[in-house]
């Protein structure tokens, strides 16, 4: 499904091995979730799947196609193939709006006006359902592990296009 989402082949980066060897906190969280019946499979298998997904090597173009697929109701804008049901778009978008920037998600939403997801490799992808998907990639990260330049680029695009719902054009009500 991920290949269909981005429209091309992805690779597992070398970071997978080092991340697997050092992800003690995530291992603890996985077993804690298992204890509270929130992980229904083997925690080690679930954690390995999560770590592999976090270690996927993608380009800014791949991120943009993935974001565009979500924005386009599950239809890949390049291949024109339905990747997932359109009814999942609001669920995906609300999820990345609330946790895509982890503890900074609220600040991000207010200052950018677009739900977005960050990656530790310096990528940020944003989704405006029914409008477009956008991404930027720049490895220098801030103290929270988010790309400084990618954030600035996406905020610039949103503000330049007047699409930030929190500071965009105002409607005048006429009696």
What role is predicted for each listed range?
Residues 70-175:
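Structured C-terminal helix/loop/strand segments within mature extracytoplasmic catalytic/sensor domains
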Residues 13-79, 83:
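Active-site-proximal helix/loop microenvironment
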Residues 6, 66, 121-122:
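Short glycine-rich loop/turn motifs that provide flexible caps or phosphate-binding loops at active sites
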